[in-house]
Amino acid sequence: MSSLGSLPLPVSPDNDPLRDPALYINRELSQLDFNFRVLAQAMDPQVPLLERLRFMCISCTNLDEFFEIRAAAVRHAQEFGLPPAPDGMSPQAILTAIHDRAAELVDQQYRCWNETLRPALMDAGIGVLGRHSWTDRQKRWLRAYFRNEIMPVLSPLGLDPVHPFPKILNKSLNIVVVLKGTDAFGRAGHLAIVRAPRSLPRIIQLPEKLGGPQNFVFLSSVLSTFVDELFPGMEVQGAYQFRVTRNSELVVDEEEVENLALALRDELVDRGYRPAVRLEIAQDMPRDIVRTLLQNFGLTENAVYRIDGPVNLNRIIQLYDLIAQPDLKYPPMTPRTLRDSDGIFETTARQDLLLHHPFDAFTAVLDLIRQAAIDPNVLAIKQTLYRTGKDSLIVDALIQAARNGKDVTVVVELRARFDEEANLGLADRLQEAGVQVVYGVVGYKTHAKMLLIVRREGRKLRRYVHLGTGNYHSGTARAYTDISLITADADIGNDVHLLFQQLSGLASKMKLKRLLQSPFTLHTGILGRIERETRIAAAGRPARIIAKMNALNEPQVVRALYAASQAGVQIDLIIRGACTLRPGVPGVSDNIRVRSIVGRFLEHSRVYWFGNDGAPEMYCASADWLERNLLRRVETCFPILDPELAKRVYREVLQNYLDDNLNAWELDADGIYHKRAPAHDEAPHSAQMALMQGL
C-alpha cells in the first residue's frame, strides 16, 4: 500500500467553481428523503405484512429523531444567525423546506396506515379497531379497563391561574380536553390536560371472547372515549390528542466540566423538557386550542402537523411482537458460523478472518472475547464500546476477564446519542468489576470499533485484533450489515495498541503503519487517494473509486470527487442515507453514480475501494464521509490485506450491491431518487437475498 506521505492533497482556491451551491443537495432534505425510501418498503406488497408495518414504524421513529436532532440544529442555527449551508440555503429556508417535505411524509405515513396496512391486517384476521366500530360488549369491557387500569394513574390538570400550563414530556401522548360547567369549588371549566404515563400500553389487546383472538385498540382512543369520567359534573365538549417533540441534543461543555459523567447525568434529567421543535395535533383540533399550544411551547405555525390517527404511529410496532403469525414475517435466517470457533486464536494466527454480518454470525466475535476471558495466556484486553444493548454478553465476558485477573481497559463513549444513560450504567458496572474505564477524549466522540487482546505465546507476546464497521451489539448485528476483521497482523496490532495509548493516556499523535484514523489521517487519507485516482485518469489510464457508506456531506471530499469525475475517474457511491453530492451534472459529475439500498437489513457497512492503477486498495471503516466522522470523532479505517478476503469484500459488498435491481434507488442530478427495476433482459437481483443464499 502507498504511504500517506506520497499522496498529494488537492488544493481548492476560494473561487473554485466546484463550490457553487447549485452543486450541493441540502443535507437535511436528503436525510428526509431516506425516510420516503423506507416508507416505500411499507407499501411494497412483496414484503410480508408485519414487516411492512415495521418499515412504516421505522420511518416514523426516524422522523422523530430527525426533528429531535437535525431540525433542532437548524432552528439553533437560525436563532444564532449562522451562515448558509454549502447548498446556499439559509436556516430559515431549510426550516420552511423541512416543514413542507415532512408534512408530505407524515401524510404518506398515515395514508399508508389508514388505507393500506390497517385494511390488510383486517383481511389477515387482525383488527385494530377505531372507537366508532366497537361493539357494545367491547365498549363495556374497555370502560371497565379504563376504570381499573388507566384511570388510577392519570392526573388531569385544569388550566387556570392556579394551575398553569403543565410541563409536557418529549414525545408523550397528551389529551387536551374542552370543558363546560363548574367544578366542586365553583371554578368555571375551560381547558384541561390529561397526560398519559409511559407506563401505560399504547395498544390494548381485547379478550378473545369479544370478537376474536387478535383485536386491538389504541390507548388514545380509549382515553378520548372515556375522558369524561375524569371530570364528573362537567360537560366534555371535545378531546384532542397532541404530542410535542423537543430538542434532544445534550449540551455539555466538556472543557469546562470536571466530571463528564456527572454533567451528563444532570443533562439527562432535563432532556425531556428542552425547547420544543414540533407539535403533532389531532386533525380536528380547533384553531383557538392550537394557538394556545403554540404559545405555550414557543412554536410557530410551520412546526404544526395535523395527523389522521394516533399521534405516535411508531408505537404500533408493538403489534409485531403481539401477533403470532410467522407467515406474516420474514422467514428466519440462520447465519453462517465459524467451523472452529473454539480455536479462534490458532485460526487467526494462521490467517485473517473476515465476517460479513448478519450473514456471518456475530457469535464469532463474542467467542473471541469469551475465550480471551478464560485463556490463562491472555494478559490484557482493551476495547471500545459505543452501543452494546441491554444484557450484553460482551460486557459479561469483559467482567469475567477482569475477575479472572486480566488487565481490562474499556473506552466507553458516554455521549452515544440516546444511549447516554445506558452507557453511564455500563461504565459503573464495569468499574465495580475492576475494569479500567475511560471516557475517551474531550471534544471527540470515540466511534471506533476496536478490540485488542494481548496473549503470551511461548517467549513472545502476540496481539490479536478485532476491527469492525458496526457496534459490539448482538441485536444490531442481526439486523444491520457490517464487516468484522479478526487479525493477528503485527502492524495492525501495533497501530491499535498506539490508538488505545492515545485514548487511555496522554500520548502524542503517532504515525500508524496500516490504519487511517480520525481526526488525524483519515480525512487527508481519503482526499489523497481520490487525488491519486484523479492523476491516474488525467494520465489517460483507467481509474475507479467505489465506496459504500451511510452518508456523505464533507465538502472537501465532495469537491475532490467532482474533480476526479471531471478527470475521467469512474465513481460508484452506495450511500444508504443523506448525500449532498449531486451526480450526473454535465461537466462536473458525469462519471459519478449514486445509489441507495433499502431492504430487509439496515445497510451499515462502510467500505472504500480505490483502483490504484491496477494495484487496488480495499478499506473498511467505522466512519462515513461526514464532517463529524472525519474531523470531530475518533474513527478507524483499516485495510483488508489478504488478497482473497479483499476479493470477497469486493464481490459481496461492492459488485453485489451495484448489481441490485430490486432494492436499489438511483439518485439523479435533480436530487430525486428513482426506484430501480430490472430491465426486460435482466434477471432480478437482490444483494441481500443473494447473500442470504450464499451468493
Set out the residue ranges of the language-model regions.
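Polyanion-binding catalytic cores of nucleic-acid enzymes and NTP/SAM-utilizing transferases
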Residues: 557
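Hydrophobic alpha/beta core scaffold segments
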Residues: 570-574
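Cofactor-pocket helix-loop regions in the catalytic cores of large enzyme subunits
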Residues: 550
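N-terminal localization/anchoring segments of enzymes in phospholipid and broader phosphate metabolism
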Residues: 1-545, 554, 563, 567, ...
